[in-house]
Amino acid sequence: MARIDPVRRAKIGRERRRLTRARLLDSAFRMFGRTHGRNTRIEDICAEAGVARGTFYTYYKGLEPLLQELSRQLTRDFNREVHVVLRKLPDAVERTSAAIRYFLHATVAYPRWGWALVNSSVGRYLYGAALERLALASIQEGIDTGEFSLPGAEVGRDIVLGAGFAASITLLRGPTPPDYAEQVARQLLIGLGVSRIRASRVATRRLQTLPAPAFMTLGVRGASASAQSQRR
């Protein structure tokens, strides 16, 4: 029997581990991406991925570490694309409005992505830690410039992210008016201290189109396809 080169064997082992990890993430994405996905258990993910429970614990110590990684995968690229646009906007009012509208529109366009975020977000921010920090900084800037009237940036951040969470669920359950995201953005800005006239104008401003977010249909990018072929 021919001996496999140790270097090649190690490479094959790394690739198998990568694909198994990707399969677990992809399975978690599909399970949490259901309407009632919040009740997903480790056993459900293992069954969906076609792996033993012991294999799961080789990669994750429990459900929480998996959810943290899933959240990063689901929000990383989209956060980056949104941030590129937000940096071009002139002030905190414009950025806050655009951010909430982008995410709410994406929730409607990609409901599995939306449900996965909602169902896996218990105990953490809906759109990830990076956006939480960005929201806090934008709110603080708005307070400093007098655009927002709030007792503190944390209050504004929680108003924004809380509204985003609740509105996402409403949109996912539907039906809602076509301009529901704009209605939420308008009332949100008013709640932050922006005048009604300006809030209405900003919340309905045309948004720049983002690149097609293909990753939203698959939380682990293209790795799942390779993992699927491994199982054939």
Walk through the language-model features, giving the residues of each:
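C-terminal peripheral helix-coil segments that are non-catalytic and often amphipathic
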Residues: 1-8, 137-144, 173-232
